[in-house]
Amino acid sequence: MLVFKKSALGALLCCFTLPVLAELPTITVLATGGTIAGGGISETKSNYVAGQFGVDKLVEAVPQLKDIAKIKGEQIVNIGSQDMNDQVWLKLANAINQGCSGSDGFVITHGTDTMEETAYFLNLTVKCDKPVVMVGSMRPATAMSADGPFNLYNAVVVASDKNSAGRGVLVAMNDAVLDARDVTKTSTTAVTDL
């Protein structure tokens, strides 16, 4: 009888789990580089080079993402955000506008130096009504206390939420969600800089 109960429970869980998995939203992660993809020579040193890891490595660093969304990754560029320019902005806007029908939301990994400019530009040029959420970090991916994985997880949660649709471009960092027009970098070193 105990075997039957375990089998019945397993079948029941299977039947209820599969439909939930099938309903996970598809989120496209568009990677541009920045500190969130940065790498240093040591976990304890503060020097690093931005844009050292691609979108696949960023997503792999947060295995819990598979529980909240189906992730598609696209590497737009892999640069420090001080090198961001209008050509990259247009490429991002086009990727979102053209990919709108195939995704339930978008997350853009980005450096914080020019995140506010990119967010504002995309807020004006993206015509997709799906959630668009920008995310970055103040510590590189190789740092002992990297904030990127937590920020990326939260950005995917926000992009997966249907209530985020139609709100323009959002920025999710440090347990906060901001509108593109309200984002300002206030410190070059503080983790809570936006």
State where each predicted segment sits:
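Bacterial N-terminal signal peptides that target proteins for export
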Residues: 1-11
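Active-site histidine-anchored catalytic micro-motif
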Residues: 23-194
